Amino acid sequence: MKYSTSKLKFNLLISASVFSILTGCGGGGGGYSGGSGGSPTYATTTTTISSTPTTTNPNTNITNTTPLLMPASVPQPVVTGTDIVGVNLQNTTSSPLAAHVFTFGQIFKQGDVLPNDTLVARINGTAYPVQLDILATWPADGSVKLGAITLTTPAMIAGSTVGVLLAKATGSDPTFGTTPAVDLVSASASNNLTLNVSFSGVSPSPVDLAAALHTALTGSPTYWLHGPLATQARVDVPHSGSLHITADVTAYADGSLTADVQFNNDFTTVLPSTGAANPAAALPALQYTATINLQGTSTNHTVSQIQYTDWHVVRNTTGAPMLNVSSSTEPAINVQHDLAYLEHSGAVLPYDRTTGVANDSTLYGSAFYSIAYVMGTTGFGTPFASNGLERYMGQTGARPDIGYTTMWNTVWLMTQDSRAATVALAQGDSGGAVPWNFKLANGHWLTPGDWPNIFVGYNNGPQGGTDGIANYSYTNYPSNDPTAWYTDTGHQPNLAYIPYIMTGQRWYLDRLYAQAAFCEISMTPFKSSPYQASGRYAGQLTSDPSLANAADIVITPGNQLRGSAWDMREIQEAAFV
């Protein structure tokens, strides 16, 4: 039996004719074209090893002794048409890890995996059944583009690496057969699930997420994961004002549970154009302590949360799988993907896989010096931390957080090192801390798809011929506040795309969608562009009557080329997955 689920798609409007603009600002182009028909050919430098991978200890990437870190050597396909792609699972801790269920993200080349294919994981010569949840498909043939891979890991000794080869099941391989999907309702009931969030400083309190989840599951739930190893569903509970609490709850076959709880202060109201200044000024930050109680175990988080920001925390019951999520420490299990395969799929840009990355955390200016510095900074991995990013995005020059993707994402891709992964995942979380998360009451991220004349930028508000949003000030960056953010699409970092395709975690897709939506609404609407009425561009684009009031034109002469390029990078990545 095949287990899969499809996610809800983002309400994006894309003008395909402007994709080539990405090459105009040093950003590169064509990194996401993908597909079997037009994929370029690159030299493969990844070491080919047996299709029956072995367990090694220690792994040099984990012990951090290798002077030069090269792309990870992962199991390579041996049987054409059956073997697909390999990964490594690394125990980054100093203690043994028992066998447990684990989920990660995997990009597939077009045509490699069809929706009805059954996958297995070949580990040390033995095949194990795999749960595949389909997160994105290739439009040309419907094959799987991005999947959430859930499997049961073997027991792993401290510092060890286990090679895993994903393959299509053959007649002799074990499968789940008719095993039913984990029943989240029954699992919640049998565990007497309690998942409460209480507040000190804001009301009402508490929020019973377990009861809300039960109500949602008795209707027509949408599952993110749904199979014999794990089932995940989402519940969202409005709290007060623009604050709402979202929880992605996962039940596993052994009865354990995980909850990814989001505190989203992002609901917005659109103000139709009136020609007047914004009458709804920015609201003061919410000051509160949130207590999250899962099965009787509580944690407290005291935060100051401004509007249009989101943060999250992951809680596990005893025995629940350790997730590959950001925190102040390295993930317990690090997944090493096949960089060459990712490149050939079109999911990432092609890198020179022969140079390596110097593994020196003491050399000032080196990548791993930066990684060590960021991880050692007070507050790293906590809600609203910058995690090494430049809060004033208008700052120019020699910044490791701007480029087609960030330096930390690049090092993660090129080395698959757990330290780089830790920083990159934490920076993916930082996308929630930037005040660019604008959600409508209908659940959509705010885009021209709902409000064609919307503009969030300088002079925000219902003046100047555009619609604006309430409680937002583009110029509210206080120079004396080290925790404030100043957004600038011309220098915005690429935060959530790489974390999402590597982990398959829904939180990172939320962050990707939010940033991409902001990119759409931060560009002057086409029909309201001042360059349409006068100046050297007058009539240039409106000469085609079909474009006169087009809501889906997001690149206009009123925007800088680099800003449009980085905007389209985010929009294209969101559309890709």
Each PLM stretch: what is its role?
Residues H214-V577:
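Catalytic cores of extracellular degradative/oxidative enzymes
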Residues G37-T47, K168-V182, P435, A516-K527:
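Compositionally biased, low-complexity linear motifs
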Residues I62-V202, L213, T222-Y223, L229, ...:
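Alpha-mannosidase-like glycoside hydrolase catalytic domains involved in N-glycan trimming
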Residues K2-I14:
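Bacterial N-terminal signal peptides that target proteins for export
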Residues S15-N57, I62-T63:
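Bacterial Sec-dependent N-terminal signal peptides
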Residues Y128, P204, T299-V303:
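Short, isolated positions in well-ordered beta-strands
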Residues V18, T92-T93, L151-M156, P238-G241, ...:
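Short, flexible beta-strand-to-coil junctions
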